[in-house]
From Swiss-Prot:
GO biological process: carbohydrate metabolic process; peptidoglycan biosynthetic process; UDP-N-acetylglucosamine biosynthetic process
Gene designation: glmM
Keywords annotated in UniProt: Isomerase, Magnesium, Metal-binding, Phosphoprotein
Source organism phylogeny: Bacteria, Pseudomonadati, Thermodesulfobacteriota, Desulfovibrionia, Desulfovibrionales
PANTHER family: PHOSPHOGLUCOMUTASE (ALPHA-D-GLUCOSE-1,6-BISPHOSPHATE-DEPENDENT), PHOSPHOHEXOSE MUTASE
UniProt remark on cofactor binding: Binds 1 Mg(2+) ion per subunit.
Residue numbers bearing the Phosphoserine modification: 102
InterPro entries with a match to the protein in the record: A-D-PHexomutase_a/b/a-I, A-D-PHexomutase_a/b/a-I/II/III, A-D-PHexomutase_a/b/a-II, A-D-PHexomutase_a/b/a-III, A-D-PHexomutase_C, A-D-PHexomutase_C_sf, A-D-PHexomutase_CS, Alpha-D-phosphohexomutase_SF
Active-site residues from the entry: 102
Name used for this protein in its record: Phosphoglucosamine mutase
GO cellular component: cytosol
Length: 450
């Protein structure tokens, strides 16, 4: 069947409204436990969450379903999504589960799964679980009473992740003398990220580290990088770091308070790895949303940019298929496959800090090498998600814009995989032209797809 539950980043929605309900989480736990149970041995599942109030409810429901299916559950509490991926591998678990809605506000939540290797589940496995969950007559294969699973709290999980994340930073380098502003979005990394940076010697100025269950992503974190930028200028810090609620994405601010997106950071890291001969095939993997300037930059430096559909899962899939070690998204998902199987904001931050330390230059000088093309992105709420080619006014508008831009720009329309939104993106050489065309296309989409 189709992807009726899972979007590009798992299951997501408003709490206590279908599908993000406790009974759905219970059935998902049963389905996951049934799908991944194999043989008579004990099976293990790692469950982590961010700081949303509803996380406790979903943690309990998922645990009940998984235990009923015969899985032992290891609850690690609030930790970043990449930490759950790591712990799933580290603890030799059969499955990892993350309860988070990433950058969304507290009233939303989500559930996503990792396989035993720490990778997000492929579509066909999610569809198998969907079939089980949505079939009211599904016959669950419950284990015998003595084989029901148990639940455990893993108190040292944050420490394990810190040791792992620090292992990606050269042993002969420290962050002594660096002043770092970090905004943890009142989310999953509110404890771990500042502590890891402090252990490496940085002076850390903390924002968004007082979660109360309701303030995750509220005017803070990667969606509000201007907050970090202001604090960097105020404190004369060397760098600013803005994470999202589950800490798998990163937006960076240089010492001047200039906000850098994922494309600029990917260019910096790609050039560093190519110079060291550590980027296989000189290949960088990014999505269709990445700026044209990144593609030009890679060509000028003897590399190639491979584009994928939007979603870090698709970036990772392409990286595995082509043997690439660096990939990411403009939105700040950065994947260093030598160390991790998914986007990791703290890991990415340490790689940037390493480059700053090794080169002895300020971030503004290092990252200023990529001059982005003017790009306008507009999110339009839509009621229908029909193929754009089937809506003639929209198709005509796209064709007209492509004709006007020629080979010096591009237009992209895509539906969000997690929201009722159409993303309208226009890119070109002239900012006034780009803004005008993007507004025109957004109005057409709003008029005909409402």
């Amino acid at each position: 069947m189709g992807r009726r539950l899972f979007g590009t980043d798992g299951l997501r929605g408003q709490v206590n409204i279908y599908p993000m309900t406790a009974d759905m989480a219970l059935r998902l736990g049963l389905a996951a436990g049934t799908r991944f149970r194999n043989g008579n041995r004990r099976h293990r599942v790692v469950i982590g969450k961010d700081t949303r109030l509803s996380g406790y409810m979903f943690e309990s429901a998922l645990t009940a379903g998984l235990c009923a299916a015969g899985m032992d559950v290891f609850q690690v509490g609030p930790l970043p999504t990449p930490a759950i991926s790591f712990l799933t591998r580290n603890m030799r678990a059969d499955l990892g589960v993350v309860i988070s809605a990433s950058h969304n506000p507290f009233m939303d939540n989500g559930i996503k799964f990792f396989d035993r290797s720490g990778f997000k589940l492929p579509d066909d496995v999610e569809n198998q679980m969907t079939d089980m969950v949505l079939d009211p007559d599904w016959q669950w294969d419950y284990p015998a009473s003595e084989k029901v699973g148990r639940a455990y709290k893993i108190a040292d999980a944050p420490g394990r992740y810190i040791v792992y994340i620090k292992s990606s930073f050269p042993a002969d380098l420290t962050l002594d003398g660096l002043r770092v502003v970090i905004d943890c979005a009142n989310g999953a990394n509110y404890k771990v990220a500042p502590l890891a940076l402090e252990e490496l010697g940085a002076e850390v100025i903390k924002l968004g580290t007082e979660p109360n269950g309701l303030n995750i992503n509220h005017q803070c974190g990667s969606l509000y990088p201007e907050v970090v930028a202001a604090k960097v200028r105020e404190t004369r810090a060397d760098i600013g770091l803005a994470l999202d609620g589950d800490a798998d994405r990163l937006i960076v601010v240089d010492e001047k308070g200039t906000i850098l997106d994922g494309d600029q950071i990917m260019a910096l890291c790609a050039q560093d790895l190519m110079a060291k001969g550590k980027l296989p095939g000189n290949m960088l993997v990014a999505t269709v949303m990445s700026n044209m300037a990144l593609e030009v930059f890679m060509k000028e430096h003897g590399g190639t940019l491979l584009r994928t559909a939007v979603g870090d899962r698709y970036v990772v899939e392409a990286m595995r298929q082509h043997g690439a070690l660096l990939g990411g998204e403009q939105s700040g998902h950065l994947i260093f496959r030598e160390y991790s199987t998914t986007g990791d904001g703290l890991l990415a931050a340490l790689q940037i800090l390493r480059i700053m330390r090794e080169r002895g230059k300020p971030l503004s000088e290092l990252a200023g090498q990529l001059q982005l093309f003017p790009q306008q992105l507009i999110n339009v709420h839509v009621e229908r998600k029909i193929p754009f080619a089937e809506c003639q006014p929209v198709a005509d508008a796209v064709a007209a814009i492509e004709t006007e831009l020629g080979d010096r720009g591009r237009v992209l329309l895509r539906y969000s995989g997690t929201e009722s939104v159409c993303r309208v993106m226009v890119e070109g050489e002239h900012p006034e032209q780009v803004a005008r065309l993007a507004e025109m296309l957004a109005e057409t989409v709003q008029k005909h797809l409402r």
